[in-house]
Amino acid sequence: MNAPRLIVGLGNPGPEYEATRHNVGFWFVDQLADKLKVSLAPQAKFFGRAARTGETWLLQPTTFMNRSGQAVAALANFYKIPADEILVIHDELDLPPGGIRLKQGGGNGGHNGLKDIQAKLGTPDFWRLRLGIGHPRTLNLSQQVVDFVLHQPRKEELPDIEHALARCLLAWPKLAAGDFAGAQQQLHGKAV
């Protein structure tokens, strides 16, 4: 498998969204940028904040979640990056806080950011790193989903999400080498 050339963290721009569950994709890209010693900077032609390290781009769309595809398609089309060399990191309601799943293709699970990326790329065949935030129903909360994702994780959920982010960073060497099977094995195994 080819190494990913575009790493996209999904989220919403602005300080009011910074610490929300919906922004865990941004959190990952921020941490990865720190690890790789690169700085994200505004890139108007790509509708987001971006950084390049070697042949790999990091991107945080600033289009708001529901229009993430505009940014992803702009950068992917400009650099001729095929869908199977794109890794999108996003919040996942169907996994408990701290759950992780890496997969290629599939549906969008009602996630509007993924839905827009699929529409703008014309294919669902990009890779996804799904970071569990839980669902209000399974966490016994009365919030609607829209409310839930736009709020900060509760203090008892945050350590699990932070641990998942750390595990994803530990898997980065495998991801960067295109060893998705090895990364899946590492990420889907028991947490350490």
UniProtKB/Swiss-Prot annotation:
Catalyzed reactions: an N-acyl-L-alpha-aminoacyl-tRNA + H2O = an N-acyl-L-amino acid + a tRNA + H(+)
Gene giving rise to this polypeptide: pth
CDD domains: PTH
Compartments (UniProt record): Cytoplasm
Enzyme Commission number(s): 3.1.1.29
Family, as annotated: Belongs to the PTH family.
Lineage: Bacteria, Pseudomonadati, Pseudomonadota, Betaproteobacteria, Rhodocyclales
Entry keyword annotation includes Cytoplasm: yes
Assembly, per entry: Monomer.
Active-site annotation: H22
Record site: Discriminates between blocked and unblocked aminoacyl-tRNA: N12
A GO CC term attached to the entry: cytoplasm
Gene Ontology terms: biological process: protein quality control for misfolded or incompletely synthesized proteins; rescue of stalled ribosome
Broad class of the protein's primary localization: cytoplasm
Keywords: Cytoplasm, Hydrolase, RNA-binding, tRNA-binding
Site feature Stabilizes the basic form of H active site to accept a proton, where: D91
Top-level taxon: Bacteria
Record keyword Ion transport present: no
Single Gene Ontology MF annotation: peptidyl-tRNA hydrolase activity
Binding sites annotated in the UniProt record for tRNA: Y17, F64, N66, N112
Name the record gives this protein: Peptidyl-tRNA hydrolase
PROSITE patterns: PEPT_TRNA_HYDROL_1, PEPT_TRNA_HYDROL_2
Pfam families given in the database record: Pept_tRNA_hydro
Summary of the function given for this chain in its UniProt record: Hydrolyzes ribosome-free peptidyl-tRNAs (with 1 or more amino acids incorporated), which drop off the ribosome during protein synthesis, or as a result of ribosome stalling.
